[in-house]
């Protein structure tokens, strides 16, 4: 859901990726990024 809500990208900032990364960190992962509309966490 984090990738849908803020799903815009610009040359300087991608808030959807930041939201996804934060979501993953809260869940105990190292971070994450959006791929299309799905947030993928890094282990």
From Swiss-Prot:
Coiled-coil portions: none
GO BP, one annotated term: defense response to bacterium
| Highest taxon above the source species | Eukaryota
Which terms are listed as keywords in the entry?
Antibiotic, Antimicrobial, Defensin, Disulfide bond, Immunity, Innate immunity, Secreted
Where in or outside the cell it occurs: the entry states: Secreted
Q: What is its main location?
A: secreted
Pfam families assigned to the protein according to its UniProt record, in alphabetical order? Defensin_2
Q: Which GO terms describe its cellular component?
A: extracellular region
Q: Which InterPro entries match?
A: Defensin_invertebrate/fungal (IPR001542), Scorpion_toxin-like (IPR003614), Scorpion_toxin-like_sf (IPR036574)
Q: Which cysteines are joined by disulfide bonds?
A: 3-34, 20-39, 24-41
Q: Which family does it belong to?
A: Belongs to the invertebrate defensin family. Type 1 subfamily.
Described purpose of this protein according to its UniProt entry = Antibacterial peptide. Affects Gram-positive bacteria M.luteus, B.megaterium, A.viridans, S.aureus and S.saprophyticus. Moderate activity against P.acidilactici and B.subtilis QB935. Also affects Gram-negative bacterium, D22 form of E.coli.
Q: What is this protein called?
A: Defensin
